[in-house]
UniProtKB/Swiss-Prot annotation:
Keyword NADP annotated: yes
Organism: Nicotiana sylvestris (Wood tobacco)
Cofactor detail note: Binds 1 [4Fe-4S] cluster.
Membrane topology, record value: Peripheral membrane protein
Protein name according to UniProt: NAD(P)H-quinone oxidoreductase subunit K, chloroplastic
Subcellular location: Plastid, Chloroplast thylakoid membrane
Gene: ndhK
Keywords from the named record: 4Fe-4S, Chloroplast, Iron, Iron-sulfur, Membrane, Metal-binding, NAD, NADP, Plastid, Plastoquinone, Quinone, Thylakoid, Translocase, Transport
Length: 225
């Protein structure tokens, strides 16, 4: 049913009775039904949307996209993450049930990308907010690379112990890194300097003869039935 081999599988008898552990059974059920929460903000998410088509068909991996973090066990971040978006991303991750996994897709998510060079509002790596299981570099990565990342995550799930996973997540809570989010007053007050607007030349600066000559030469628009 599944091509991934379990290291803790004991033996298979002649009567087709499989002797295994509860941990392996839990891992098998989870890796065969990953429900991702799609957190896409940029062009990388368009590449992930290509997986829905018949050419790649990500339904064969049991992937069912969910719109609620409470029903998802995998969050896939794609695109630039800004300081203003960081609390929302952390909140979504916190609302996901355990065990949960993260795939960082694209250069903008992993390092901040080209937007982190001179930007003061870009998070330079989503792993400063939430723990990442699989890094998927590229700008943007191809759909084949996304499938490879999902396959690697499935292999990782098949070999892990549930207790170790929970202990690791509690010990390495990378999303608790403090960011100095200072509340600033809004600068968009609706007031603007009207003096900088473009002012057309006054008609008093144009000679009267030239003004009326130009006015008469402009024909009024005709309605066409």
């Amino acid at each position: 049913m599944n091509s991934i081999q379990f290291p803790l599988l004991d033996r298979t008898t002649q009567n087709s009775v499989i002797s295994t552990t509860l941990n392996d059974l839990s891992n098998w059920s989870r890796l065969s039904s990953l429900w991702p929460l799609l957190y896409g903000t940029s062009c990388c998410f368009i590449e992930f949307a290509s997986l829905i088509g018949s050419r790649f068909d990500f339904d064969r991996y049991g992937l069912v996209p969910r719109s609620s973090p409470r029903q998802a066990d995998l969050i896939l971040t794609a695109g630039t993450v800004t300081m203003k978006m960081a609390p929302s991303l952390v909140r979504l991750y916190e609302q996901m049930p355990e065990p949960k996994y993260v795939i960082a897709m694209g250069a903008c998510t992993i390092t901040g990308g080209m937007f982190s060079t001179d930007s003061y509002s870009t998070v330079r790596g989503v792993d400063k907010l939430i723990p990442v299981d699989v890094y998927l570099p590229g700008c943007p990565p191809k759909p084949e690379a996304v499938i490879d990342a999902i396959t690697k995550l499935r292999k990782k799930i098949s070999r892990e112990l549930y207790e170790d996973r929970i202990r690791s997540q509690r010990a390495n809570r990378c999303f608790t890194t403090n960011h100095k989010f200072h509340v600033q007053h809004s600068i968009h007050t609706g007031n603007y300097d009207q003096r900088v607007l473009y002012q057309p030349p006054s008609t008093s600066e144009i000679p009267t003869e030239i003004f009326f000559k130009y006015k008469n030469s402009v024909s009024s628009p005709e309605l066409v039935n």
